[in-house]
A protein has these predicted regions:
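A polyanion-binding, active-site-adjacent surface
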Residues: 1-184, 198-205
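Intrinsically disordered, low-complexity regulatory segments in eukaryotic proteins
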Residues: 185-194
Length: 206
């Protein structure tokens, strides 16, 4: 991935496109790579990632079985928030990832992921305190899916109240949604994982 569509390419060590199986039903979308992610080229490998792994287990999911990515694929300098023009420049990558992976459930972590994904699905974004733990139906990139909005794990590291809300969202709401899509009646995934792996890699080469 040698993208130069926004200024963030000037600061990155490695782009962090995302990782995980392409035949999964569940996609996790965070905000942007941090320092550790930039160094390793992998999403959620620092302290927030450790917490995410635990939260996923609370929802009945192992990290290895979900696809994990971010709204922007390169680290903003000093871990500042991504700017609107950086988010817009990077959005086609996320839309293509959704088109190829066809998740049934997207877990949006933090307000940037929540706002972008809800707007793409035709919903309004107000605030995390009002909307965390809510489930939204929608279509993104032609894929019918559900979005659950919750707090960013990094925000929960030093704030017990946020951590409590985040843990409840994963253990109750997200767990219930995961059980729902795993029921036999929800149907088999189509398409070969191998074919999608190839087209996703081709896409990032462009
Ligand atoms: N925070 C994010 O939003 N994404 C990462 O990949 C790591 C930390």
């Amino acid at each position: 991935m040698n993208c130069t569509k926004c200024r963030l390419h000037r600061y990155r060590t490695n782009p962090v496109p995302g990782e995980g199986p392409l035949d999964t039903d569940v996609m996790v979308v965070g905000e942007a790579p941090g320092r550790n992610e930039d160094l390793q080229g992998r999403p959620f490998v620092g302290a927030a990632g450790q917490l995410l792994n635990k939260l996923l287990l609370d929802a009945g999911l192992r990290r290895e079985e979900v696809y994990i990515t971010n709204i922007v694929k390169c680290r903003p300098p000093g871990n500042r928030d991504p700017k609107d023009d950086e988010i817009s420049a990077c959005l086609p990558y996320l839309l293509r990832q959704i088109e190829l992976i066809k998740p049934k459930l997207i877990i949006a972590l933090g307000r940037h992921a929540a706002r972008v994904l809800l707007e793409q699905a035709g919903h309004k974004w107000h605030s995390m305190s009002k909307q965390h733990g809510h489930v939204y139906d929608g279509v993104i990139s032609g894929v019918r899916l559900r979005i659950v909005v919750t707090y960013h794990p990094a925000a929960a590291l030093y704030r017990p109240q946020i951590r409590e809300a985040l843990e409840k969202d994963f253990a109750e709401v997200i767990r219930r949604e995961v059980e729902r899509i795993r029921r036999p009646s929800s149907g088999e995934k189509r398409g070969s994982s191998q074919a999608r792996q190839t087209s996703l890699l081709d896409f990032f080469k462009k």
